Swiss-Prot record:
Main location (coarse class): nucleus
GO terms of biological process kind: oogenesis
A cellular-component GO term for this protein: nucleus
Entries under InterPro entries matching the protein: P-loop_NTPase
Stated role: Has an important role in DNA replication and in maintaining genome integrity during replication stress. Promotes PCNA deubiquitination. As component of the Elg1 RFC-like complex, regulates the functions of the DNA polymerase processivity factor PCNA by unloading it from DNA after replication during the S phase of the cell cycle. The PCNA-unloading might be regulated via interaction with the Enok acetyltransferase complex. Might have a role in restarting of stalled/regressed replication forks during replication stress. In the ovaries, has a role in nurse cell endoreplication.
Name of the protein in its database record: Enhanced level of genomic instability 1
Self-association state and partner proteins as the record states: Component of a heteropentameric Elg1 RFC-like complex composed of one large subunit (elg1) and four small subunits (RfC4, RfC38, CG8142 and RfC3). As part of the complex, might interact with the Enok complex, composed of enok, Br140, Eaf6 and Ing5. Within the Enok complex, interacts directly with Br140.
Keywords for this protein: ATP-binding, Nucleotide-binding, Nucleus
Compartments, record wording: Nucleus
Gene3D superfamilies per UniProt: P-loop containing nucleotide triphosphate hydrolases
UniProt keyword annotation of ATP-binding present: yes
């Protein structure tokens, strides 16, 4: 029975402390309130039998609970009404009595005693039989069977008055009770009765669910879970004990120096853990740890309240139970047994304990381990205190001050070996950063192996294989190979003789013909690759070394412009001259200042230099002279003479005007300061731009290379105060990076920057020119505002790289949809597939500038650089460069800096330039000349003996082949049988720019067609070369085909014919030709399967059969045409295209075309 009493008292502790439960001996009931359990006594853990008895009692009580439930319900209903009248009378009396009492802290009492006045019940004693659900505690049923006699006046309640209810203690005690039960805090029994009556349906439903759960074996499952949990806790506690013993043993090995401070011999130091077990000693000799005096308590606190607060201060508690907060009521027999066990226990670990700092005895509260061993041990480190709301005596506060002082002095004595120093925390900027030691390669390898330990074997093997392959590739591959076995095979390196289908002259005859050439004909230069004949070495001795000289400064440039104005129809000659003169003056003055002061590459001009420069420019209107070291400046012509404002655009004005109208809706003032529009115009533009739709913020500029697309954007951005954010093909244009860099710019309307758009050194100089150069409008110019709106420019959007531009197209459409700033997309290919959606919305087409306007612009530019060039020469070079203005400007700058035409070159012979050397189209001032060798300078390189000086357009080759064959020096003269020789007739001029660029050679040529027949195979070969890479749409396509074509033609003519000077035709007649090969690639042209699967004969056959059927029927519209759905124009069903296809090849061979009734495949 001892074990049973022990277990039952443990569960009764939260609700009843002084009253004895039914079933316990009377001696326990008498001794429990008189002799309270000492908190310093170590209790033995419950035996295994007590756990089994506890499980059996829970099963029995669960069955008893169901039988008594109905009985208690009937009693509650009968006694509720009688108790209601008595409660109303007692309520008024209790209110008056409670007003006179002093507040006292809540202390731990029995469930019958909570809420009573002077230990007497306010309501009927029959009320005690009401069941109270207390977290499914098994002892709640014993409280219902108690007799009224047992509920008497307890000694504890009579000794002290009722304490004042503390809010926190009330909440902590109330959470142990179920909902609807407010036994401890209720003051009016009427409220309890009303609450119980209202909660009757809920209680019935809850009881019904509990019955169903018990029928299904819920109690057994709950007991099994609790047993399993207790077993796990027991195992964990045993493991913790073993680890604690191991730690204690390891700590005992460490030798610590004893403290020099005097210590009290009667007090032994505790273990290092703040939570140490203390037991009360019965004998001083067998004492393990001496008991310390209890904590000084407040006057209004009782032992139960103090013990409750000390246990609430524990930071770790059992999760599912609140029994750890209350002491376990034990019988005196158990206490005696535990005392004997504590006395007989030998001090096993006392000598090994490590002494730590000795603190005050009154600081650490004494906590008795009254919980069973299965409960987790609670740590007191950083515990919270719950007694702040209690009324404490002033004596305790006064004693706390010297305790802290003693403690501080004692800590200093113990730690005298390590003197305390005030730490100084410095900012990371002032802390010396020590270099990190290089990690050990073996450690890094071990870490890498640990991180890859979870990787599957298949992936690891693949990574190792890839790594080995990369290593092998790096070791074996050389960027620049040491030995190159691939070379260019010369034409004369073959062993066998060169097979030529026509007769050649002997070497003696060829040398005689070469010596017989006139003196004004062009010969090979000293640095050229010649045929190594004796005549070449003889003529090379007479060549003198030539040095290029600086061009002389022209004095009367305005006189040239006045003479040219009449010839330049509909071109602003004087406006162009004035703009270029201002730019030339400005940059020449800057270059002179830099050359004088020996300034660096930063192009910075000091204030003094700028002042003197402005004064000189204001006083002297003459042209500024550049320094001798850089007679034409240090900037490229493409940067030096590019337009800065909209009014400076002279060519290709229509697309620039359209782009300006698009940007004017985004600009604040509708344009620049000098070209600002009125408020009404700006308002109208904003309304128009708003009506463009959701995609009005994006514009696509499409045009060939060097047509002025990018230059127009930067010009208008500078004119309309925009800041350009450029993205070109040289950047890594992934979609993620593009969105991250431009998302902020697209969402913000303005960007504040002090710098100018374009931000380079040349751009800064151009801005200075913009402010100080144009004097006529200087008064109207206002300083530009610092607030610049952003503009996004995406260059080369039609060029995509698979590895570097992942997600670039999606990023463009995302920016176009979400951007609040204008987005301008520049493309060269109008048929780009991934930009078709943007091109269908807003697009501006740029065309190559007109040859006549560009030639006049370049003529004025060359005049400003003191090198006037013939207008026809500029047109020829511009057309030769496929209307590439950038390339023409670069070649023009190289030609001017090279000195223009040299005296020797003017007298020497060679392939004639397409100009008239006798008469020039441009008028000149007396004493100056016009340079006329610009075209020949780039079409006749020095390292080639003979070169065709016109673009190798193979449609023009048929026009010039007879003249080339007639001028051949190696072909023997032949005459056709019965035919005489005739001289070649001169061609008449049909060119809009100049007369036909041809002259009679005076040589005889045969009228026989054998000359063309000898080059038939050669014509086929160069036809294939002209079509190479026809399916590629990049900027190098034309140049590559041009070089290949030139190489084929020049080597063939030089090796097989050895042609000399001959006239040529640069402009072809406007003849309309149809060529299917222009739309096919190399693979199709050289593929036999493509030729055998040609579908055009089948289509022509279908068209002819449909035409014959329509002519034979009465109504031609009865049946639709077979190819009706495949017309060029979907909205029109005309058959004119099919009729045209029927007439193809009909006149040449009407019967040669077979009739085929094949149907086109889908």
């Amino acid at each position: 029975m001892t074990d049973v009493n022990c277990l039952t008292s443990e569960h009764i502790a939260p609700t009843t402390t002084t009253a004895s439960p039914p079933g316990t001996p009377s001696k326990n009931a008498a001794t429990d309130p008189v002799e309270p359990t000492s908190p310093f006594v170590l209790r033995a853990p419950p035996s295994a039998k007590s756990k089994l008895i506890l499980q059996n009692m829970e099963e029995v009580l669960n069955s008893v609970k169901q039988k008594h439930r109905e009985k208690h319900k009937r009693k509650r209903e009968e006694k509720r009404r009688a108790a209601l009248m008595e409660d109303q009378k007692s309520t008024t009396e209790e209110v008056k009595a409670n007003a006179k009492e002093k507040p006292q802290p809540l202390r731990e009492k029995s469930s019958q005693e909570n809420g009573l006045k002077n230990g007497r019940r306010r309501s009927s004693p029959l009320k005690s039989s009401t069941p109270v659900a207390d977290n499914q505690s098994i002892m709640k049923h014993f409280a219902k069977a108690g007799k009224p006699e047992n509920v008497g006046v307890s000694p504890v309640s009579t000794a002290k008055p009722k304490p004042t209810t503390n809010v926190f203690e009330f909440m902590m005690n109330a959470r142990n009770r179920s909902l609807g039960v407010n036994e401890g805090g209720a003051e009016s029994p009427a409220d309890q009765e009303i609450g119980s009556e209202a909660a009757t349906p809920t209680t019935k439903r809850k009881l019904l669910l509990q019955e169903w759960n018990e029928r299904k074996g819920g109690a057994k499952r709950r007991l099994a879970d609790e047993a399993r949990g207790e077993f796990i806790e027991l195992q964990m506690e045993q493991r913790a004990k073993r680890l604690r013993k191991m730690l204690t043993k390891t700590d005992a090995k460490e030798v610590t120096a004893p403290s020099s401070a005097p210590t009290d011999p009667t007090v032994k130091r505790l273990r290092g853990r703040p939570r140490s077990r203390r037991i009360s000693s019965m004998d001083a000799q067998n004492q393990i740890v001496e008991s310390k005096p209890p904590v000084v308590k407040a006057k209004d606190q009782d032992p139960g309240t103090e013990e409750l607060l000390s246990k609430l201060s524990s930071p770790t508690k059992k999760r599912d139970s609140l029994l750890g907060y209350f002491p376990k009521v034990e019988s005196p027999k158990e206490l005696a047994e535990k005392v004997i066990i504590a006395i007989e226990t030998p001090p096993m670990e006392t000598p090994k304990r490590r002494t730590l700092r000795r603190k005050s005895q009154q600081e650490t509260p004494i906590v008795a381990e009254s919980t069973p061993s299965s409960r987790p041990r609670r740590s007191c480190v950083g515990k919270a205190r719950y007694d702040y709301d209690l009324e404490t005596s002033p004596g305790k506060q006064q004693k706390a001050k010297p305790q802290k002082a003693d403690e501080s002095v004692e800590i200093i004595d113990l730690d005298n070996s390590n003197p305390a120093a005030t730490p100084k925390k410095l900012a990371p900027l002032f802390v010396r950063q020590l270099p990190k030691p290089s990690p050990d390669p073996s450690v890094l390898k071990a870490r890498q192996a640990f991180l890859q330990s979870g990787v599957p074997d298949k992936i690891r093997q693949e990574q190792i294989r890839q790594k080995n392959f990369d290593q092998m590739y790096e070791d074996s591959y050389e960027v620049f190979p040491r030995l190159a076995h691939i070379g260019c095979e010369s034409f004369g390196s073959k062993n066998g003789p060169l097979d030529i289908p026509f007769a050649l002259r002997a070497e003696e005859e060829y040398s005689e013909v070469t010596k017989a050439l006139p003196a004004n004909k062009r010969r090979a230069k000293a640095s050229s690759i010649t045929s190594c004949l004796p005549a070449d070495f003889t003529s090379s001795k007479t060549l003198n070394k030539f040095n290029y000289a600086t061009l002389p400064q022209l004095e009367n440039k305005r006189g040239f412009v006045k003479l040219w104005k009449n010839d330049f129809d509909r071109f602003p000659t004087f406006k162009c001259y004035n703009q270029m003169r201002e730019k030339y003056r400005h940059f020449s003055a800057i270059d002179s200042a830099q050359d004088t002061q020996q300034m660096g590459e930063s192009l910075v001009v000091t204030r003094r230099t700028r002042r003197s420069m402005e004064q000189n420019m204001a006083q002297n209107e003459e042209e500024a002279k550049p320094p001798p070291s850089a007679p034409n400046g240090e900037l490229l012509f493409t940067e030096k003479y590019k337009p800065l404002l909209f009014e400076q655009v002279l060519v290709n004005l229509t697309p620039v005007q359209e782009l300006r109208e698009f940007l004017s809706s985004w600009s604040g003032n509708g344009g620049s300061n000098r070209n600002s529009q009125g408020m009404d115009d700006t308002f109208d533009m904003s309304n128009d731009s708003a009506s463009m739709g959701s995609s009005s913020n994006t514009m696509v500029l499409v045009g060939p290379s060097s047509s002025g697309k990018t230059n127009a954007v930067f010009t208008l951005a500078n004119d309309m105060n925009f800041n350009v954010l450029e993205i070109n093909a040289g950047m890594k244009r992934t979609g993620k990076k593009l969105i991250q860099e431009l998302q902020e710019a697209t969402q913000s309307h303005q960007i504040r920057k002090d710098g100018k758009a374009g931000g380079g050194s040349s751009q800064q100089l151009l801005q200075k020119l913009q402010k100080s150069g144009l004097k006529a409008k200087a008064a109207a110019v206002e300083p530009p505002s610092e607030v610049r709106k952003s503009l996004i420019l995406i260059e080369d959007a039609d060029i995509l790289f698979d590895n570097l531009d992942a997600g670039f197209t999606d990023a463009i459409y995302t920016l176009a949809a979400s951007s609040k700033r204008p987005v301008i997309v520049v493309a060269t290919d109008p048929n780009c597939a991934h930009l078709q959606r943007l091109m269908q919305q807003n697009i501006i087409h740029f065309q190559a500038p007109n040859a006549l306007n560009i030639s006049r612009f370049l003529a004025v530019l060359s005049l400003m650089e003191n090198c006037p060039i013939e207008l026809d020469e500029l047109i020829s070079v511009y057309l030769y460069n496929q209307q590439n203005l950038r390339k023409t400007l670069m070649e023009l700058q190289f030609y001017i800096q090279s000195g223009g035409d040299s005296t020797r070159d003017r007298t020497g012979g060679g392939i004639k330039s397409p100009t008239k050397t006798s008469n020039s189209r441009l008028a000149t001032v007396d004493g100056s000349r016009i340079h006329q060798r610009f075209f020949e300078f780039f079409t006749s390189p020095q390292n080639v003996q003979y070169r065709i000086p016109f673009p190798v357009d193979f449609s023009l080759l048929r026009l010039n082949l007879p003249d080339l064959m007639a001028s051949s020096a190696m072909l023997k003269e032949q005459q056709a049988a019965g035919g005489g020789s005739r001289t070649a007739a001169k061609r008449k001029s049909r060119s809009p720019k100049k007369a036909w660029l041809s002259s009679a050679t005076g040589q005889k040529s045969d009228g026989h067609s054998s000359s063309l027949a000898t080059l038939a195979s050669f014509y086929d070969n160069i036809s294939v070369a002209s079509l190479m890479d026809s399916d590629c749409s990049d900027r190098l396509q034309w140049h590559l085909s041009e070089e290949i074509g030139h190489l084929l033609v020049e080597q063939a003519l030089q090796t097989g014919l050895a042609t000399k000077e001959c006239p040529y035709n640069l402009f072809d007649k406007p003849v309309q030709r149809f060529s299917i090969c222009q739309h096919l690639g190399n693979g199709v042209l050289r593929s036999d399967s493509a030729k055998s699967l040609d579908f055009e004969p089948a289509l022509r056959s279908i068209c002819r059969s449909e035409k014959e059927r329509a002519g034979l029927e009465r109504k031609s519209s009865r049946f639709y045409h077979y190819l009706r759905n495949h017309t060029v124009n979907v909205t029109s069903f005309t058959t004119d295209y099919f009729d045209t296809a029927c007439s193809t090849f009909q006149s040449a061979a009407p019967s040669s075309e077979p009739t085929m009734e094949a149907e086109p495949k889908d």
